[in-house]
Amino acid sequence: MKSFSRISGVILLLALIAGGIFYWNPLWVNDQQIRYHLWRAGVHSEYVEAGGYRLHYFEATPPDGSPGTPLVLIHGLGARGEDWAAMIPSLAAAGFHVYVPDLLGFGRSARPDVPYSLPLEENDALAFLDAIHLQHADVAGWSMGGWIAAAIALDQPQRVDRLVLYDSLTLKFDPTIAQDAFVPTDKASLDRLIAVLSPRPRALPGFVIRATLRKFHRTGWVIQRTMDSIFTKKDALDDRIAAIRQPTLIVWGAEDRLIPIAVGEATHHDIPGSVFVSVQGCGHLAPGECPKPVLAATIEFLKAQPPMHGGEETLPGVTK
């Protein structure tokens, strides 16, 4: 009986500790769950020295042991490699050797005190490709990552075989939110940011809101410096994007309130032979919120022989 009581006490203590960890650091707990899911799916977490800094990245290979077609996924502003979690295992299973870096200043990569900007992150992505000895690959970018992917396709076209842009920051447009909105300081400003990112935002518990605001307080300076670069619009690709010659897929959430679908349509118009797919019911976070149609369009495009050329399609959104 005493032994049972001791075991029960230990279990209760562990439950209290686990509950306390989740309450005080829910974002960390969520990250561990995502990383465990990726690990179970055969996705490896790695580090590499690139451009003088330590960068974290995920790597996944086809389960059949084949080399796989190299595919690099580049995340957006304020994001990290984990944001591709809904797509990485499926892309590897489809025959791709997937590399997913955390850009400089984000995720588990180094966060040096430097003047963050779009060109700096492009150089960081190129340094990553050099560090892992990847001469060329299919390259996909989401939001700010789309700018980086498109810029690489223009500046070093031999490095990009096929290009995929998801709700991408490619052309000039009038922002729907203020410059400082990406670094919320209270519940009201966080609610406004979430409402712009997702057409159907979920209500967050108070302890999750507080943890999220603490994270923005710690790392928001990187986002703000990058936003300073973005809002000048001096690095917009309007005058260059028509020079992209790689087969290009453009995927857009039809309800994107951050970068309106009109930007995607204009990008499609400007890139010769590009394929445009809009996903109904999805917003700026389409690859994460609606991974099934986004994955289907991506895999079909990247595996097509000969490469797909031109065309438009609308897909129904399928939320997780």
Place the predicted regions along the sequence by residue:
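Short beta-strand/loop motif that positions the catalytic acidic residue
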Residues: 244, 250-252
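Conserved hydrolase catalytic core segment
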Residues: 135-173
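Catalytic active-site module of serine/aspartate enzymes centered on a nucleophile-bearing elbow/loop
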Residues: 274-275, 281-320
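Alpha/beta-hydrolase fold catalytic core
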Residues: 1-69, 93-96, 303-320
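Active-site loop/oxyanion-hole signature of alpha/beta-hydrolase fold enzymes
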Residues: 48-51, 58-61, 93, 100-140
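Conserved alpha/beta-hydrolase catalytic His-Asp/Glu region
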Residues: 24-29, 184-245
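Conserved HGGG/HGGXW glycine-rich cap/lid loop of the alpha/beta-hydrolase fold
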Residues: 60-108
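Acidic catalytic loop of the alpha/beta-hydrolase fold
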Residues: 255-259
